[in-house]
Swiss-Prot record:
Protein name: Acylphosphatase
First-level EC class: hydrolase
Coiled coil: none
Bilayer-spanning residue ranges: none
GO molecular function: acylphosphatase activity
Organism phylogeny: Bacteria, Pseudomonadati, Pseudomonadota, Gammaproteobacteria, Pasteurellales
Enzyme Commission (EC) number: 3.6.1.7
Length: 90
């Protein structure tokens, strides 16, 4: 299992991005969370197999139809949390 952190930029707040992201994560079997950031971006932490996280990354690059993703940054997640499901954090 790998853990990755993504920061999604663009028109990604106020458009249902967190809801759709959680739905896609559950569909793919991803664990972790999604959370709005003060700068207008969205942070996503994803835990799963290489294949699951790669498919999730591909989805995040596009986002849901209601959003406009302009940039996606990816880095190793070093937060130390262990996830058992995927949640929307406030």
């Amino acid at each position: 299992m790998i853990q990755r952190q993504f920061t999604v930029y663009g028109c990604v707040q106020g458009v249902g991005f967190r809801f759709f992201t959680a739905r896609e994560a559950n569909k793919l079997g991803i664990q972790g969370y999604v959370k709005n950031q003060a700068d207008g971006s969205v942070r996503v932490v994803a835990a799963g197999s290489d294949r699951q996280v790669a498919a999730f990354r591909d989805w995040l690059e596009q986002g849901p139809p209601t959003a406009e993703v302009t940039n996606l940054l990816e880095q190793e997640y070093t937060g130390g949390r262990v996830f058992s499901d995927f949640t929307i954090e406030r």
